[in-house]
C-alpha cells in the first residue's frame, strides 16, 4: 500500500520515450521540487533575503518599485488564471479519464505549485527584479509545457479522447508563456546590476497619461475624424492580409482545372495587392493613411513642443542656472520627436503586427489543425521573447549613449557661445580635444549598442528560419504522406507566413526604436516633471493701478540650505523714491533685485508691493510693472529694432525710436548701414558693452513701468555717456519707484536712501550726506573711489568734476 501503486504506475510508463504519461512524471517531479524551494523561500523574511541591488537602490527607486506596475499586475492575474485553469483541468480529468495515482499526483502538484508561486510573487512584488527561485520555477514550467510537442502526432490526435486535453494544454501554454514573459523578461536583467530604472517600460501608464492629451487632437474635430479613418484603414488592411493567401490557394487549385479557371480571382488578388503594397510600405491604403496622418503628427509635435517650451519658461532662475542650455535643447528635441515615433510605430506597426499574429494563429488552428497553429504560435512567442529580452538588456547602453550625446552637445554649444573667450586665451586646441574626447566616449557606448544589435539580429534570423523550415516540412508531409492538404494549401501556408514574417523582421528594429523613444521621452518627462519653484497661488490677483511703494520685511534667502545670502533685511521705499544698494561683490545686491522681481521665492520674510505680499499677485502682472536693466545684458540674435521693442511688443516704430533717443543710442543706430535693422549677433556680441546696455535701457524706457530696477546699468559706459544717461535715468525715475545697484557711488549720491550691504546684511543706511557723516563703511568706499578718480584725472590731464 502507500506509494506502491504510484511507483508501479511510474515504472510502467517509464521515462523514455517521452509521451503524455511521461510528461506527467517529469512535471510531477519538477513541480514537487519547486514547491519545496518556494515554500522555503516564502518562509524567509524580506529583510534577510533582499538582494544587493534592492539594498543599493535610492529612496526614489525604492518608492517607485513599491508600486504595482502593469507587468506585476498582469503577472498576478495570469498566475491566478493558471490556478483556475488547473482546478478546471482537475475536474475535467477525473470526470472523463480513469483514476490513477499518477494523474492525481500530477494535478495536485501542479495546483500547489501555482498557488505557492502566486504567494511568493505577492510577497516579493516590491523587489525591482524577479526572485531567482521564481525565475527558475517559471522557466522550468515553460520547458515542461513544451515536452508534449516532442510527440505531437500521438498527443494531439484529433480523433482521440485527448481532444479536451489539447484544449486545456493550449490555454495553459499561452498562460504560462505570458507569466514567463512578464516575470522573467521584465525583471530578470536587474540581477546583472541594473537598477529598476533600466527598463524603459517602467511607469508606462504614467507616461501614457502624460502624453495622451497631446496625441488625441481634442482641439480639432476634423483631426479626430482623420484618426478614426486611419484606424478604419488599419482594419481593412488586416482583412486584406488574410484574404490574399486564401486567394493564392484558390488560384493554384483552380490551375489544376484550366478549363474552369476563374480570371476574376487573379484580378481580385492583384487589386488587393495594390491596396496592400509591400507590407507596411508602398500600398495605396498606407499612402492614404500617411497623407491623412501628417496633420495629426504635426498637431502632436506642435502641442508638445509649445507646452514644454512654456514649462521651461515657467521654471525658476535657480533651475536655469544649474542646467546647460545645449543639453536641455537636445533633450527637448529628442523628446518631442520620440512621441511621434512611439505613436506611429505602435499604432501602425506593433498593433497591426500583433493583430496579424493573433489572426494567423486562429486561422491556422481553425482552417488547418492545431499543429500549424502551434508552429506559428511557438515561433512568434520565441521571437518576441528573445527580441524583448535582449532589447531590454540593451536599454542601459542606449541610456548611457543618450547621456554622453547630451554632454557632447553641451560642450559644443558652450564652446561656440564663448567663442570670444576661447580666442582670448588661445584655447582652440584645448576645446577641440575636449570635444573629441566627448565624441570618443560616446562612440565607445555606441559600439556596444551596435554590437548587441548585430547579436540580436542573428538570433532573430535563426528563429524565423527555424520556424519557416519546420512549417514548410510539416506542410509537405501533410501533402505527400497524409494526403490531407493540396498544393494550394502549401502556397497558402508559405504565402501567409512570408507575409507575416516580413513585418516581423522589422519588429525587432521597431521595438528598439520604440524603446529608445521611451528613453528619450523619459528624459523629456524629467524636464516636464521638474517642479515650478515660483508660481502663482490659486487666489492670486492681477496687480493693477500700482501706487509705487515697496516694503521688505525680515527678508531671508538662501540658494543652498543653511547658507543664507540675504539675512533678515528690512526697508521701505515710497512712491517716486529711489533706493541704492551698494557694497562689495557677493554682498547680495543682485540677489535682492531678483527677489524683488520674484525670480526666486524668499526663504523667510516677505516683500510687499503697495502693502500686499507679492505672492498674492500674479507674476505676469507684477513683472509688467517692473522694468529692469541687468548687470550683464544679453540680447537676442535679431535686429536692434526687435531687441528694443521686446520691452513692449505692441509698440510702434516711432515709440521705439523715442526710447532709443532717451537712452542716447539713436544716433549710433542711425549711423549703422542698416540702421534699426542691424543684426546684433549671438547674445549681442556685435555691439559693445556700452551699446548693449543702452539698448537694454531703451527697452526698459519703452516698457513704461512703475518700478525701475537698475543693476549697475551704467557700469560699461564711458564717463560722458554715463553722466548723460544718469540724468536721463534720474528723470525717468522721478515719478517712479527705483532700486539701483551701483558700484560707482557717484551715480547714487541723489538717492533717497542708500543701503550698504555686506554678506547679506545691512551695515548702514541713510542718504549720501548722512552716511558720510557716520564715517563708516560707506565713507571709506567714497573716499577710496574719489582718490581713484582723482588719480585717473591727473594721469589723463582732465579736470575732476
UniProtKB/Swiss-Prot annotation:
One annotated Gene Ontology cellular component of this protein: vacuolar membrane
Source organism, top-level taxon: Eukaryota
Lumenal side: 1-24, 97-101, 151-167, 248-264, 365-371, 483-489
Gene3D superfamilies registered for this protein in UniProt: ABC transporter type 1, transmembrane domain (1.20.1560.10), P-loop containing nucleotide triphosphate hydrolases (3.40.50.300)
Binding-site residues for ATP, renumbered to this chain: 583-590
Summary of the knockout phenotype: RNAi-mediated knockdown causes hypersensitivity to Cd(2+) and exhibit Cd(2+)-elicited changes in cellular morphology. Even at the lowest Cd(2+) concentrations they arrest in the early larval stages and eventually die. The intestinal epithelial cells of hmt-1 RNAi worms upon exposure to toxic levels of Cd(2+) elaborate punctate refractive inclusions within the vicinity of the nucleus.
Protein's membrane topology: Multi-pass membrane protein
Biological process according to GO: cadmium ion transmembrane transport; cellular detoxification of cadmium ion; detoxification of cadmium ion; detoxification of copper ion; heme transport; response to cadmium ion; transmembrane transport
Subcellular location: Vacuole membrane; Early endosome; Late endosome; Recycling endosome
UniProt entry keywords in alphabetical sequence: ATP-binding, Endosome, Membrane, Nucleotide-binding, Transmembrane, Transmembrane helix, Transport, Vacuole
Record InterPro entries: AAA+_ATPase, ABC1_TM_dom, ABC1_TM_sf, ABC_transporter-like_ATP-bd, ABC_transporter-like_CS, P-loop_NTPase, Type_1_exporter
Pfam families, sorted: ABC_membrane (PF00664), ABC_tran (PF00005)
Residue intervals of the ABC transporter domain: 550-784
Tissue: Expressed in coelomocytes, as well as in head and tail neurons, and in the intestinal cells.
GO MF annotations in UniProt: ABC-type heme transporter activity; ATP binding; ATP hydrolysis activity; cadmium ion transmembrane transporter activity; heme binding
Bilayer-spanning residue ranges: 25-45, 76-96, 102-122, 130-150, 168-188, 227-247, 265-285, 342-364, 372-390, 462-482, 490-510
Principal location listed in the UniProt entry: membrane
Positions in the Cytoplasmic compartment: 46-75, 123-129, 189-226, 286-341, 391-461, 511-801
Residue intervals of the ABC transmembrane type-1 domain: 227-516
Family classification: Belongs to the ABC transporter superfamily. ABCB family. Heavy Metal importer (TC 3.A.1.210) subfamily.
Functional note: May play a pivotal role in the detoxification of heavy metals such as cadmium but do not depend exclusively on phytochelatins (PC) synthesis.
Listed name of the protein: Heavy metal tolerance factor 1
Organism: Caenorhabditis elegans
UniProt gene name: hmt-1
Amino acid at each position: 500500500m502507500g506509494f506502491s501503486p504510484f511507483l508501479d504506475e511510474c515504472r510502467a510508463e517509464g521515462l523514455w520515450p517521452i509521451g503524455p504519461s511521461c510528461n506527467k512524471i517529469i512535471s510531477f517531479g519538477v513541480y514537487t521540487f519547486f514547491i519545496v524551494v518556494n515554500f522555503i523561500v516564502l518562509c524567509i523574511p524580506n529583510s534577510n533575503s533582499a538582494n544587493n541591488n534592492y539594498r543599493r537602490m535610492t529612496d526614489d527607486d525604492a518608492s517607485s518599485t513599491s508600486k504595482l506596475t502593469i507587468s506585476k499586475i498582469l503577472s498576478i492575474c495570469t498566475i491566478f488564471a493558471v490556478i483556475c485553469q488547473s482546478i478546471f483541468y482537475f475536474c475535467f480529468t477525473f470526470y472523463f479519464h480513469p483514476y490513477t495515482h499518477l494523474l492525481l499526483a500530477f494535478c495536485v502538484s501542479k495546483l500547489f505549485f501555482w498557488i505557492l508561486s502566486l504567494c511568493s510573487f505577492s510577497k516579493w512584488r516590491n523587489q525591482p527584479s524577479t526572485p531567482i527561485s521564481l525565475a527558475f520555477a517559471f522557466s522550468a514550467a515553460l520547458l515542461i509545457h513544451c515536452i508534449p510537442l516532442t510527440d505531437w502526432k500521438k498527443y494531439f490526435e484529433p480523433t482521440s479522447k485527448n481532444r479536451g486535453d489539447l484544449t486545456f494544454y493550449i490555454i495553459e501554454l499561452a498562460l504560462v508563456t505570458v507569466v514567463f514573459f512578464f516575470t522573467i523578461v521584465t525583471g530578470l536583467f536587474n540581477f546583472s546590476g541594473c537598477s529598476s530604472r533600466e527598463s524603459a517600460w517602467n511607469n508606462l501608464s504614467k507616461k501614457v497619461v502624460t502624453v495622451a492629451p497631446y496625441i488625441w487632437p481634442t482641439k480639432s474635430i476634423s483631426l479626430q475624424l482623420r484618426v478614426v479613418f486611419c484606424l478604419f484603414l488599419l482594419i481593412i488592411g488586416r482583412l486584406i492580409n488574410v484574404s490574399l493567401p486564401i486567394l493564392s490557394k484558390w488560384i493554384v487549385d483552380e490551375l489544376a482545372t484550366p478549363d474552369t479557371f476563374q480570371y476574376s480571382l487573379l484580378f481580385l488578388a492583384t487589386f488587393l495587392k495594390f491596396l496592400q503594397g509591400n507590407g507596411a510600405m508602398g500600398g495605396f491604403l498606407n499612402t492614404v493613411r500617411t497623407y491623412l496622418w501628417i496633420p495629426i503628427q504635426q498637431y502632436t509635435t506642435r502641442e508638445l513642443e509649445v507646452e514644454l517650451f512654456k514649462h521651461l519658461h515657467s521654471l525658476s532662475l535657480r533651475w536655469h542656472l544649474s542646467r546647460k542650455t545645449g543639453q536641455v535643447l537636445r533633450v527637448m528635441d529628442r523628446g518631442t520627436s520620440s512621441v511621434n515615433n512611439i505613436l506611429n510605430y505602435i499604432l501602425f506597426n506593433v498593433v497591426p503586427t500583433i493583430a496579424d499574429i493573433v489572426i494567423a494563429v486562429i486561422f491556422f488552428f481553425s482552417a488547418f489543425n492545431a499543429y500549424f497553429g502551434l508552429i506559428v504560435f511557438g515561433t512568434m512567442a520565441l521571437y518576441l521573447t528573445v527580441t524583448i529580452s535582449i532589447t531590454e538588456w540593451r536599454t542601459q547602453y542606449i541610456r548611457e549613449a543618450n547621456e554622453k550625446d547630451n554632454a557632447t552637445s553641451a560642450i559644443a554649444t558652450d564652446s561656440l557661445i564663448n567663442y570670444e573667450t576661447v580666442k582670448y586665451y588661445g584655447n582652440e586646441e584645448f576645446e577641440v580635444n575636449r570635444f573629441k574626447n566627448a565624441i570618443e566616449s560616446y562612440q565607445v557606448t555606441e559600439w556596444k549598442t551596435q554590437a548587441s544589435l548585430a547579436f540580436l539580429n542573428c538570433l532573430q534570423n535563426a528563429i524565423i528560419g527555424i520556424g519557416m523550415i519546420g512549417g514548410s516540412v510539416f506542410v509537405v508531409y501533410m501533402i505527400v504522406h497524409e494526403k490531407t492538404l493540396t498544393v494550394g494549401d502549401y502556397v497558402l501556408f508559405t504565402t501567409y507566413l512570408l507575409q507575416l514574417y516580413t513585418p516581423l523582421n522589422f519588429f525587432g528594429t521597431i521595438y528598439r526604436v520604440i524603446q529608445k523613444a521611451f528613453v528619450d521621452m523619459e528624459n523629456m518627462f524629467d524636464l516636464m516633471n521638474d517642479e515650478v519653484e515660483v508660481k502663482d497661488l490659486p487666489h492670486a490677483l492681477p496687480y493693477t493701478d500700482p501706487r509705487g511703494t515697496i516694503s521688505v520685511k525680515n527678508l531671508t534667502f538662501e540658494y543652498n540650505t543653511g547658507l543664507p545670502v540675504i539675512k533678515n533685511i528690512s526697508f521701505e521705499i515710497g512712491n517716486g523714491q529711489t533706493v541704492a544698494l551698494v557694497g562689495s561683490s557677493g554682498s547680495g545686491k543682485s540677489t535682492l533685485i531678483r527677489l524683488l522681481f520674484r525670480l526666486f521665492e524668499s526663504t523667510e520674510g516677505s516683500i510687499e508691493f503697495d502693502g500686499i505680499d507679492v505672492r498674492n499677485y500674479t507674476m505676469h502682472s507684477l513683472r509688467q510693472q517692473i522694468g529692469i536693466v541687468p548687470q550683464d545684458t544679453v540680447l537676442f540674435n535679431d535686429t536692434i529694432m526687435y531687441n528694443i521693442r521686446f520691452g513692449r511688443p505692441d509698440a510702434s516704430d516711432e515709440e521705439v525710436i523715442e526710447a532709443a533717443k532717451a537712452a542716447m543710442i539713436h544716433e549710433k543706430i542711425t549711423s549703422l548701414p542698416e540702421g534699426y535693422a542691424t543684426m546684433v549677433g549671438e547674445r549681442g556680441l556685435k555691439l559693445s558693452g556700452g551699446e548693449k546696455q543702452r539698448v537694454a535701457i531703451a527697452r526698459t524706457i519703452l516698457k513704461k513701468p512703475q518700478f525701475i530696477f537698475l543693476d549697475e546699468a551704467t557700469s560699461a559706459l564711458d564717463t560722458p555717456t554715463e553722466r548723460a544717461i544718469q540724468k536721463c535715468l534720474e528723470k525717468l525715475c522721478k515719478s517712479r519707484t527705483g532700486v539701483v545697484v551701483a558700484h560707482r557711488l557717484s551715480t547714487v549720491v541723489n538717492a533717497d536712501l542708500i543701503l550698504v550691504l555686506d554678506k547679506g546684511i545691512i551695515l548702514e543706511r541713510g542718504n549720501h550726506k548722512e552716511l558720510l557723516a557716520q564715517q563708516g563703511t560707506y565713507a571709506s568706499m567714497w573716499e577710496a573711489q574719489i582718490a581713484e578718480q582723482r588719480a585717473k584725472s591727473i594721469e589723463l590731464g582732465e579736470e575732476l568734476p
